[in-house]
UniProtKB/Swiss-Prot annotation:
This is Probable histone-arginine methyltransferase 1.3. Ubiquitinated by PQT3. InterPro entries: Arg_MeTrfase, PRMT_dom, SAM-dependent_MTases_sf. The modification N-acetylmethionine is found at M1. Residues 507-516 have a biased composition (Polar residues). Keywords: Acetylation, Activator, Chromatin regulator, Cytoplasm, Methyltransferase, Nucleus, S-adenosyl-L-methionine, Stress response, Transcription, Transcription regulation, Transferase, Ubl conjugation. Belongs to the class I-like SAM-binding methyltransferase superfamily. Protein arginine N-methyltransferase family. PROSITE patterns: SAM_MT_PRMT. The keyword Nucleus applies. It catalyses: L-arginyl-[protein] + 2 S-adenosyl-L-methionine = N(omega),N(omega)-dimethyl-L-arginyl-[protein] + 2 S-adenosyl-L-homocysteine + 2 H(+). Residues 494-517 are annotated as: Disordered. CDD domains: AdoMet_MTases.
Length: 535
């Protein structure tokens, strides 16, 4: 049997200037102490023993965290509960070294022993993954988490977000305009990424900022922060998930950019409220504070034809001798299960929008697992309704200034754009007609949501009071798999120039069937003669 890498490490001891319990109210002792790394009964431990006391502080390195407060001053914290239930408290000690060399050597040993501890405890004897997973790991599939953290661990994607000047500029303004909320306060940056929000908080006068980042971007954040010495000593980068890590103190302010497409995509809002419950003081503030999902029905004939024609490829009866039509229905359903991400003209909306509010200071993590939104609109025009358009905004409720960050159509475009759920069966509506429905979001383990959308046009005129339904259309969408249309032309070409070169012999009518021209002509005839009536 192979000897564990932990067992191969020799027991190490370090002489310390002093060690004191964080929870102790007594004056710190100046008596010397000894720190010992050891492997006991299958567990890697770090023990602190004061020379004038028999009391020993024991830490399981699998859950221990080390924080640097100065050249020779550190804090070590760890889970203080031995139960398998959710961690509810932590224990910690103040550590002071005799010199910087001792502190550096200790930190290197701490990382080496802790990493080996994680490797040793990651699998069971039969090779299966340990059941001792974090809350995040229990609800998110490993492949999705790996791709997610890989994506956000790359600088090019961080640059994409930093260059969203609406996003970055609004955060900067919200922090600086409310500097009194940050000055002298402890701040936690949830999902810190490059660390830009942590540096905003430090510029606003934060006493200390804990930048928590689970991806490899944490290393870039350390490098970037170190290159800005004006506030580098007030920012500590912690690599890990907020569900797993421990902090040496409570936070007065939480700051984060947890919003995804449709506000909730990527399910980071759950981590945001978990950080609130674990780290924030009862009277702390959250930046952002609330979010709103805005919704309105829309009419866009060009988009509908574009999506319908994508599936027409599968209508070919002689594609290199193969009949593709058996898959047409599945292809059509697949295209219309993709939410469309793009920027659209707000004049395409056929009713005034409504919104659903999410209060980050009050929402529980479980409240994000299923979100049910009843819909009710009044059509403002006679047209064909093609689906539901959605966008979001968030509020930074500072003590001095309340500032909104919006992704609304017609406003400056952000990297979130807007999202539209297109019905495979559009509905005709008349001006003044009531539109009802339901937007039902169910979270899944791929860090996204399944969307069930139903829209109905209620009877109008004399029978409206009876509440009868004239038409109804339902579609299911996967928010994880959108159709990114940002670079696509917003108008569908209604005619094409004849080809300059003759087509290959296979491209004859009997070989490759063209889209149903009669259907396309019928759809295009629905376009209003006066463009302003539609837009």
């Amino acid at each position: 049997m192979e000897v564990s890498s932990v067992k191969k490490l020799e027991q190490l001891e370090y002489s310390l200037e002093s060690v004191t319990d964080l929870s102790s109210s007594s004056v710190s002792s100046s008596s010397p102490a000894v720190a010992t790394f050891s492997y006991v009964d299958g567990v890697t431990e770090l023990r602190f023993l004061q020379s004038d006391s028999t009391h020993c502080f024991n830490f399981d390195l699998a859950s221990a965290q080390l924080f640097k407060l100065g050249p020779v001053h550190f804090i070590c914290v760890s889970d203080g509960s031995s139960s398998s239930e959710e961690k509810s408290f932590s224990k910690g000690v103040n550590i002071k070294f005799k010199n910087e060399k001792d502190s550096k050597d200790f930190c290197e040993s701490f990382e080496e022993w802790r990493n080996d501890s994680v490797v040793q405890g990651s699998s069971l004897q039969n090779g299966t993954v340990s059941a001792n997973k974090s809350k995040f790991d229990n609800k998110i599939e490993a492949s999705s988490a790996k791709m997610y953290f890989h994506y956000y661990g790359q600088l090019l994607h961080q640059q994409n977000m930093l260059q969203d000047y609406v996003r970055t500029g609004t955060y900067y303004a919200a922090v600086m305009e409310n500097h009194s909320d940050f000055a002298g306060r402890v701040v936690v940056d949830v999902g810190a990424g490059s660390g830009i929000l942590s540096m905003f908080a430090a510029q606003a006068g934060a006493k200390h900022v804990y930048a928590v980042e689970a991806s490899e971007m944490a290393e870039y954040a350390r490098k970037l922060i170190a290159g800005n010495p004006l506030f580098a000593d007030r920012i500590t980068v912690i690599k890990g998930k907020v569900e797993d890590i421990e902090l040496p103190e409570k936070a007065d302010i939480l700051i984060s950019e947890p919003m995804g497409t449709l506000l909730v995509n990527e399910r980071m809002l759950e981590s945001y409220v978990i950080a609130r419950d674990r780290f924030m003081t009862p009277k702390g503030k959250m930046f952002p504070t609330v979010g709103r999902i805005h919704m309105a029905p829309f009419s866009d004939e060009f988009l509908f034809i574009e999506m319908a024609n994508k599936a027409m490829f599968w209508q070919q009866q002689n594609y290199y001798g193969v009949d593709l039509t058996p898959l047409y229905g599945s292809a059509h359903q697949g295209y219309f299960s993709q939410p469309v991400v793009d920027a659209f003209d707000p004049r395409l909306l056929v009713a005034s929008p409504m919104f659903h509010m999410i209060d980050f200071t009050q929402m529980k993590e479980e409240d994000f697992y299923e979100i049910d939104i009843p819909l009710k609109f009044t059509a403002s025009m006679c047209t064909r309704m093609h689906g539901l358009a959605c966008w979001f905004d968030v509020l930074f409720d500072g003590s001095t200034v309340q500032r909104w960050l919006t992704t609304a159509p017609g406003a400056p475009t952000t990297h979130w754009y807007q999202i539209r759920c297109v019905l495979s069966q559009p509905i005709y509506v008349m001006a003044g007609q009531e539109i009802t429905g339901r937007l039902h979001l169910i979270a899944h383990s791929a860090q996204s949501y399944t969307i069930d959308l139903t829209l109905s046009a209620k009877m109008w005129g004399p029978g409206a009071s009876q509440g009868g339904i004239l038409q109804s259309s339902t579609c299911k969408f996967d928010l994880k798999e959108p159709y990114y249309r940002m670079s696509q032309p917003q108008a569908y070409p209604v005619a094409q120039e004849p080809p300059l070169q003759p087509q290959p012999e296979l491209s004859t009518q009997q070989d490759i069937q063209t889209p149903n021209d009669e259907l396309e002509e019928e759809l295009l005839q629905q376009l209003p003669q006066n463009p302003s009536a539609q837009l």
